[in-house]
Amino acid sequence: SWWKKGGDYDLVIADDYIIELAIQEGLVQKLDASRISSYDNLNPVFMSQFYDPQNEYTVPYGAGIPLIVYDPGLTDVKITGYEDLWNPELENNVALTANYRVIDGITLKTMGESFNTEDLDVIRAAGDKLLTLAPNIRVINDNNTQDYLISGEVAAAFLYTSQVSTALQARPDLEVVYPKEGLGFGIMAGFVPAKAPNADAAYAFLDYINQPENAAKCFEYIGYYCTNKAAEEYISE
């Protein structure tokens, strides 16, 4: 992959499970927090996570809980959980994000399993069940997935936190579902690749975006949960 080759990027912002793999493969250099004057602004709630328990490599950039959002004007299905996405009445009427890790996770939850099970038999069974969702899926797209819901092209969608926020701003009439099977949770974080050509620039950028007012602007724009405690007072209601 591009990051195994290295040398092209000074800073990478990635999902937690990807970061875990990158660290395991030696693709991430240890973080020198002393070079980030705004480091103490970070919220410890989003630190010391499974992918970086000692905070040796990463700086959190955002967190979120993917959710189902649906248009009650386009379907009579009362959606209360992931399992409802399989309802035949939603044929060709569901949009999904293009993240297999997440979509496989919600399928596992419909089976009463953990998002993070490592049981291969269970994972294979989830894959088989996921195939049965195909008739209901109209689109799989990671970027601006909410647009299909906003426009009325689909009746239901499984969206990232930022997409949920955007959808509700455009269509307050949409319904948000906190699935009865349980919620997923993820964190994005930044790291400096082992072969970063200009680590100084990466540290300068990390310092800049974690200044309170700058961080607030970032979180208001991306629509994820704020991971910078000092920025909270600058975020609008």
Model region roles, listed by residue range:
Residues 2-7:
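Short, well-structured alpha-helical segments in soluble
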Residues 183, 188, 193-237:
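Mature extracytoplasmic/periplasmic domains
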Residues 1, 19, 82, 145-148, ...:
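Short, hydrophobic alpha-helical packing/hinge segments within bilobed ligand-binding/sensory domains
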Residues 8-153:
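Extracytoplasmic ligand-binding site segments that recognize negatively charged/polar headgroups
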Residues 146, 150, 168, 193, ...:
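Generic hydrophobic alpha-helical scaffold/packing signal
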Residues 105-109, 165, 207, 220:
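Generic alpha-helical structural context detector
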Residues 124-132, 170-194:
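Periplasmic-binding protein-like
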Residues 19-21, 150, 156-173:
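A ligand-binding cleft/hinge motif common to bilobed small-molecule-binding domains
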